Amino acid sequence: MQESQYKEKAIIGTGLITTSIGGFFFLRRFRRISNASTIPKNYLNNSTVENRKYKTMFGYVTRVGDGDNFRFYHTPGGRLLGWHWLRKVPCSRSDLSNETISVRLAGIDAPESAHFGKQEQPYALEAKEFLHNKLYHKSVRIIPLKIDRYARLVAGVQYYPIPHFFWKKDIGPQMIRKGLAVVYEGSDGVFCPTKKECLLALEIVAKKKKLSLWSQGKKLILPSVYKRGV
């Protein structure tokens, strides 16, 4: 009798320990990250890592700022953990305050929007509209790479052309292909998941076709040059 009770208690104890450990790892894996300052360092990928080893974050785009940045609300686990049907993403700016991550697209540079009293560059609006149409109020998967000097998360960004399907596309090459952005040339550039060489090849084609910003010919001022004058 005592032996039976002992075994029963041992089984219950083992079950509680296993559940506790499982719960700890579950909460750790699916913990929501509210802003860039709370992103763990081990979330940041080396851009040379193999595709299958990328650490990614799944979330929802709440606002598009310009042609190469947006606000990202982290929804770990997506619909499987109830997001958008049991758990709602806040809508108002006050509710979203300090709850979203500012994301800068890795590997590309879009025309500059108007700020600091300076006019926007040609095709800045078109670049923003393209990004808005692809990402706004949609779920995306990002590949975190680094935090830049403006406290933005620089990341590769993959969107879903067909909502709720697993097939996804890297947004950066789409913008390069249409002439709505150029390849980022700064020494601090990071490229993921599409490599710099592939982006440069797409840029050459867009330039030859004189698409969008490349239609300006010799009047073109690269975003990096324009920013230095701000």
UniProtKB/Swiss-Prot annotation:
Compartment annotation? Mitochondrion; Membrane
- Main localization of the protein described in the UniProt heading: mitochondrion
Q: Where is the active site?
A: R104, E112, R152
Q: Which residues bind Ca(2+)?
A: D109
Q: Name one GO cellular component term.
A: mitochondrion
An MF annotation (GO) of this entry: endonuclease activity
| Transmembrane annotation, as ranges | 10-27
Return the EC number: 3.1.-.-
Record-annotated TNase-like domain positions: 55-216
- Keywords associated with the record: Calcium, Endonuclease, Hydrolase, Membrane, Metal-binding, Mitochondrion, Nuclease, Transmembrane, Transmembrane helix
Membrane association type:
Single-pass membrane protein
The cross-references to InterPro entries, in alphabetical order and at most eight, read: SNase_OB-fold_sf, Staphylococal_nuclease_OB-fold
PANTHER family cross-referenced by the UniProt entry: EBNA2 BINDING PROTEIN P100, SERINE_THREONINE-PROTEIN KINASE 31
Q: Write out the similarity annotation.
A: Belongs to the LCL3 family.
Record's protein name: Probable endonuclease C19F8.04c
